[in-house]
């Protein structure tokens, strides 16, 4: 089993301090490896290594035939290629996704823009779009300052479900760690609830199925 962990917070997590979403995603990956000791793990930390935005220069590079690209264009496309290769190889994907201003982080959006490539991770057919990243189990660890689960103000879940599904990843589970900005006790309770959700997934055997 190959696991890809994507940390998308703007904050690092090290020595027990920093991004709660990255911490919980790491805990989930560790639990997955407990059940699959031979599993390999790739961690894509977008705080430590931010991915560049999809700007005009990047678009020009992508739409230039490979044999006609400048060295700078080839280097830019190679950055996206690396992310695509990681997600193509993964059997299980764990995404740490904190809520920033009611949505996903800029870091996660840049990652999505990099992996969404026509004729590579999705294609248009006579019957409509078809995602090409099929057969993957995806866990999204959501951290929020307040309470947004099942609320109209939760813009993360609908967007992520749509864009991941568009790319072929329809087996998606969301794990919620809310109330992170509501004081130490509420924050700790939110983390505890997320850990309970992780434990339940593992007990049911659906974390890797």
Swiss-Prot record:
Q: Write out the residues that bind FMN.
A: 9, 19-21, 143-146
The family database entries (Gene3D superfamilies) matched by this protein are listed as: 3.40.50.360
Assigned EC number: 1.6.5.-, 1.7.1.17
The cofactors required by this protein are:
FMN
For this UniProt record, the keywords arranged alphabetically read as follows: Flavoprotein, FMN, NAD, Oxidoreductase
Enumerate the SUPFAM superfamilies for this protein. Flavoproteins
Keyword NAD attached = yes
Entry's InterPro entries?
Answer: Flavodoxin_fold, Flavoprotein-like_sf, FMN-dep_NADH:Q_OxRdtase_AzoR1, NADH:quinone_OxRdtase_FMN_depd
The task this protein performs is described as: Quinone reductase that provides resistance to thiol-specific stress caused by electrophilic quinones. Also exhibits azoreductase activity. Catalyzes the reductive cleavage of the azo bond in aromatic azo compounds to the corresponding amines.
- Family, per the entry? Belongs to the azoreductase type 1 family.
Subunit text: Homodimer.
Q: What is this protein called?
A: FMN-dependent NADH:quinone oxidoreductase
The gene from which this protein is expressed is azoR
């Amino acid at each position: 089993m190959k696991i890809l962990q994507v940390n998308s917070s703007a904050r690092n997590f090290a020595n027990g301090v920093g991004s709660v979403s990255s911490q919980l995603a790491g805990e989930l990956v560790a639990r997955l490896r407990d059940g699959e000791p031979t599993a390999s793990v790739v961690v894509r930390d977008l705080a430590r290594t931010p991915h560049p935005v999809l700007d005009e220069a990047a678009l020009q590079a992508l739409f230039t035939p490979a044999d006609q690209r400048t060295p700078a264009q080839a280097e830019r496309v190679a950055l996206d290629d690396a992310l695509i290769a990681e997600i193509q190889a993964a059997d299980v994907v764990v995404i740490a996704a904190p809520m920033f201003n009611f949505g996903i982080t800029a870091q996660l959006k840049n990652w999505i823009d990099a992996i969404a490539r026509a004729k590579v991770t999705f294609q248009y057919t006579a019957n409509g779009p078809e995602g090409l990243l099929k057969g993957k189990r995806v866990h999204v660890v959501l951290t929020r300052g307040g309470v947004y689960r099942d609320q109209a103000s939760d813009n993360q879940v609908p967007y992520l479900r749509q864009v991941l599904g568009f790319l072929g990843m329809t087996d998606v589970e969301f794990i919620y760690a809310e109330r992170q900005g509501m004081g130490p006790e509420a924050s700790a309770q939110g983390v505890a609830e997320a850990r309970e959700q992780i434990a339940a997934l593992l007990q049911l055997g659906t974390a890797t199925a």
